[in-house]
């Protein structure tokens, strides 16, 4: 994977930081960026005392800077798993990594994070429970789409409480919704912290935000080719609405964000 090789190449040019699960670190200071080398992080905020909100989940290759995360009260980065990060000073990296590669990578990843913030606002502000959960699972699945693999394994190392917090629903509602997705053949449980997406097309149909999620996550081929300079070649053939590295255009048509029918009563089954 080109992004992974690029991250490895710059690891020796920055300060490495290793985190234990649930360890917290503050946002990087102005002028610094953090690149997640491996593991998963959560961006947390606590606008009021004792009320934590998960803003996003970060995976390997994601980039965080002070300019992409608002300095809300109590904001921090929390390791979901053991994680490795690299703290970079852009001018220092510029000396050894070609400028167009370096800036293309950072800008693409930072804009990707901002686009995800907008999608998250739509998810929790306008979608009912089932399309909200479907959108969350779809976003994770699209990161791992491969043309030769019809089924996709999605790792879920975060707790269900964290997922429910991110989606602004309660724990039991999340569990019931995931069980319904299992019952109708959309997904199946692979392990305690992983699911397998069985029918990606059907999952897309459950999410009114599928087109936006595809624009942000399914361009992984472009992201993988960033460091080899091939992204610019592919960009010319992409629809204009999907350009600018995943930035959501000012006016977006994502299908109706209508309220779904009343939630069916499902008994909790003690797991997904």
Give each language-model segment a name.
Residues 142-237, 269-272:
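Phosphate-/nucleic-acid-contacting segments
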Residues 2-24:
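Short proline/glycine- and basic residue-enriched helix-capping loop/turn segments at helix->loop/beta transitions
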Residues 56-119:
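Cyclic-nucleotide recognition modules
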Residues 18-82:
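Cyclic nucleotide-binding regulatory domains
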Residues 226, 238, 247-252:
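Short hydrophobic transmembrane-like helices used for membrane targeting/insertion
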Residues 243-246, 265-267:
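Short hydrophobic alpha-helical segments enriched in small aliphatic residues
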Residues 251-272:
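Long, low-complexity, intrinsically disordered segments
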Residues 101-170:
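Polybasic "coupling" helices that flank or enter modular domains
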């Amino acid at each position: 994977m080109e992004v992974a090789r690029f991250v490895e190449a710059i690891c020796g040019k920055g300060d490495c930081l290793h985190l234990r699960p649930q360890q917290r670190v503050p946002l990087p200071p102005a002028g610094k960026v953090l690149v997640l080398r491996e593991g998963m992080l959560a961006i947390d905020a606590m606008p009021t005392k004792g009320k934590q909100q998960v803003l996003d989940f970060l995976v390997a290759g994601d980039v965080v800077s002070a300019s992409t995360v608002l300095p809300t009260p109590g904001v921090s980065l929390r390791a979901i798993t053991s994680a490795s990060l690299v703290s970079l000073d852009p001018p220092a990296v510029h000396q050894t990594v070609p400028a167009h590669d370096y800036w293309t990578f950072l800008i693409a990843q930072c804009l990707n994070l901002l686009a995800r913030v907008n999608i998250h606002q739509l998810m929790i502000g306008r979608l009912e429970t089932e399309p909200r959960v479907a959108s969350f699972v779809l976003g994770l699945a699209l990161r791992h789409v491969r043309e030769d693999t019809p089924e996709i394994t999605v790792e879920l190392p975060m707790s269900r409480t964290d997922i429910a917090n991110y989606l602004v629903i309660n724990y039991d509602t999340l569990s019931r919704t995931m069980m319904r997705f299992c019952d109708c053949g959309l997904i199946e449980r692979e392990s305690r912290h992983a699911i397998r997406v069985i029918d990606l097309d059907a999952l897309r149909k459950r999410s009114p935000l599928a087109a936006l999620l595809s624009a942000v996550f399914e361009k992984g081929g472009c992201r993988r080719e960033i460091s080899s300079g091939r992204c610019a070649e592919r960009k010319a053939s992409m629809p204009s609405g999907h350009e600018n590295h995943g930035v959501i255009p000012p006016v977006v048509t994502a299908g109706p964000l209508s309220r779904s029918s009343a939630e069916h009563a499902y008994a909790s089954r003690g797991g997904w």
